[in-house]
Swiss-Prot record:
The keyword DNA repair applies. ATP binds at residues 75-82. The gene is recA. GO terms for cellular component: cytosol. GO terms for molecular function: ATP binding; ATP hydrolysis activity; ATP-dependent DNA damage sensor activity; damaged DNA binding; single-stranded DNA binding. This is Protein RecA. Keywords: ATP-binding, Cytoplasm, DNA damage, DNA recombination, DNA repair, DNA-binding, Nucleotide-binding, SOS response. Gene3D superfamilies: P-loop containing nucleotide triphosphate hydrolases. GO terms for biological process: DNA recombination; DNA repair; SOS response. PROSITE patterns: RECA_1, RECA_2, RECA_3. Pfam families: RecA (PF00154), RecA_C (PF21096). SUPFAM superfamilies: P-loop containing nucleoside triphosphate hydrolases, RecA protein, C-terminal domain. The lineage of its organism: Bacteria, Pseudomonadati, Pseudomonadota, Betaproteobacteria, Burkholderiales.
Length: 354
């Protein structure tokens, strides 16, 4: 009995000491600097924005890319990296969000972005001269609390000032990696507080002399690999032809890292030239997988009605009948447990004081 009383006394003392410590922390660093997970003040449901690809939203496990996080999208040249990010920009703008594009490569095609559904009139764009300038602009935009999505295209083009001002053959090892490491240390906390999604596009390089394992690596050192909540590996796996003409690419995206859901899932979709990700093509493929759309030979049917012979004709039918496309998509979402996007999901501005 005495032991129980003693235990209760120690427990009460501990609780009192903890309450005093929490009070001191809040007094020194502000309310909300520390809290219990069960208090309700901590965000339990992850806010997301769609990638523009239903299959990729499903592969990500939460219905899209998580807000308030860092995301890395990498792959070989012409694999669809910029197309995918511009689709995310278009989806964020549909939700009423404000987006910025840091074009370090100085290669953004405005007319192509417009074709993908991006409202280019409202898109903020910066074409910085140095890597430091690009990351300072990113930091200022994140701290404003008024930006919902920032795209940096690309990490490989974030050239340190010392390299630009130096001679062509100068050896400056690790300079870009140190720049990225310092920037991400500074940015990550602010990104979380302002609920801003920051997407880094990255390129692939080959490591020399690798005998075992993949010789591929991404630029900018290892910091981004650690700080990114989601890493997507995008690859072109084939061509889409109409007769003898190539009209698009068959694309595979692998979720290499995912801190908000199980990783290593894959998504397959078509990217059509001048149109972006083929929503209708994905609805057909996922509809067949979920047994919502029937396929018999080359014919596709829905509710007993034939919708086209061959995927191209079925895709065209859904493009001409958007109501049926929406109906099939909603059934696919329900079957796979992926909810539709919330139209009021844009963040409330939260400025961060220096």
């Amino acid at each position: 009995m005495d032991d129980k009383k003693a235990g209760a006394g120690v427990s009460a003392e501990k609780q009192k000491a903890l309450a005093a410590a929490l009070s001191q922390i809040e007094k020194q660093f502000g309310k909300g600097s520390i809290m219990r997970l069960g208090d309700g003040e901590v965000e339990k449901d992850i806010q997301v924005v769609s990638t523009g690809s239903l299959g990729l939203d499903i592969a990500l496990g939460v219905g899209g890319l998580p807000r308030g996080r860092v995301v890395e999208i990498y792959g070989p040249e012409s694999s669809g990296k910029t197309t995918l990010t511009l689709q995310v920009v278009a989806e964020m703008q549909k939700l009423g969000g404000t987006c910025a594009f840091i074009d370090a490569e100085h290669a953004l095609d405005v007319s192509y972005a417009n074709k993908l559904g991006v409202n280019v009139g409202d898109l903020l764009i910066s074409q910085p001269d140095t890597g430091e300038q690009a990351l300072e602009i990113t930091d200022a935009l994140v701290r404003s609390g008024s930006i919902d999505l920032i795209v940096i295209d690309s990490v490989a083009a974030l050239v340190p000032k010392a390299e630009i001002e130096g001679e062509m053959g100068d050896s400056l090892p690790g300079l870009q990696a140190r720049l990225m490491s310092q920037a991400l240390r500074k940015l990550t906390g602010t990104i979380k507080r302002t609920n801003c999604l920051v997407i880094f596009i990255n390129q692939i390089r080959m490591k020399i002399g690798v005998m075992f394992g993949s010789p591929e690596t991404t630029t900018g050192g290892n910091a981004l690999k650690f700080y990114a909540s989601v890493r997507l590996d995008i690859r072109r796996i084939g061509s889409i032809k109409k007769g003898d003409d190539v009209i698009g690419n068959e694309t595979k995206v692998k979720v290499v890292k995912n801190k908000v859901s199980p990783p290593f899932r894959e998504a397959f979709f078509d990217i059509l030239y001048g149109q972006g990700i083929s929503r209708q093509g994905e609805i057909i493929d996922l509809g067949v997988d979920a047994k919502i759309v029937e396929k018999s030979g080359a014919w596709y049917s829905y509710n007993g009605d034939k919708i086209g012979q061959g995927k191209d004709n079925a895709r065209e039918y859904l493009r001409e009948n958007p109501d049926i496309a929406d109906e099939i998509e909603n059934k696919v979402r329900a079957a796979l447990g992926v909810v539709a996007m919330n139209p009021t999901a844009a963040a409330t501005p939260v400025a961060v004081e220096d």
